Amino acid sequence: HQISTDEVYGSIPLDDNVTRFDENSTLRPSSPYSASKASADMLVMSYYRTYKLPVTISRCSNNYGPYQHPEKLIPLTIRRLLHGEDLLIHGDGLDMRDWLYVIDHCKAVDTIIHSDIVGEIYNISANNEISNINIMKKISSHMNTISSIVHIENRPCHDTKYTLDSSKISYRLGHNMECNFEETFANT
């Protein structure tokens, strides 16, 4: 099973509240990281088509939860707040991300792996779309701590928004996300 990313589809304009990438959307990676993931997806599918290797691919949105890598947005924000440091945000902070609780992600991958269906791609999303700056404010509020938010230069090729249509995993495999963002956010 290949675990991929929503970044392989490229970015959606912030003001587009309609578009959701489905599994048939064109791959338009905009960074070396996302291009490497898109390339891996294509390589995996080529082995399925050529050799009938039983493969599946999942493309997920941003994960959050306990034990997340410390350089990621949520744990980094928590750590900076605990140390009384300024919060650093790229650009205007309005970039939108869909947040998927890690337990939901693991359960979805488990469902895919244990299904009899091969050669398929599944998007995994919880439809918890929140701007980066609002995530920082939510964490600050939850921790009852205030720090200055300092805007820094955006990273090159920084995508503005990813939104996935994950209905296929629901109707094909009967899997639905179970975790509520507000409840699980506190566990992070």
Segments and roles (model prediction):
Residues H1-S30:
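Conserved Rossmann-fold NAD(P)-dependent oxidoreductase catalytic core, especially the SDR/UDP-sugar
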Residues T5-G10, N62-Q68, L94, H114, ...:
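Active-site proximal helix/loop that lines the substrate pocket
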Residues T19, S25, P29-A38, Q68-K72, ...:
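Short-chain dehydrogenase/reductase
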Residues L81-T188:
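C-terminal substrate-binding subdomain of Rossmann-fold SDR/epimerase-dehydratase oxidoreductases
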Residues D15-D16, P70-I78:
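A glycine/serine/threonine-rich, flexible loop-to-helix segment
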Residues V44, T77, M136:
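Aromatic/hydrophobic pocket-lining residues that form π-stacking "cages" and hydrophobic walls in ligand
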Residues S11-L14, R28-T56, L81-H83:
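Active-site Tyr-X1-5-Lys
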Residues E23-R28, L53-P66, T77-L100, N123-S125:
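A conserved pocket-lining segment of Rossmann-fold NAD(P)-dependent short-chain dehydrogenase/reductase
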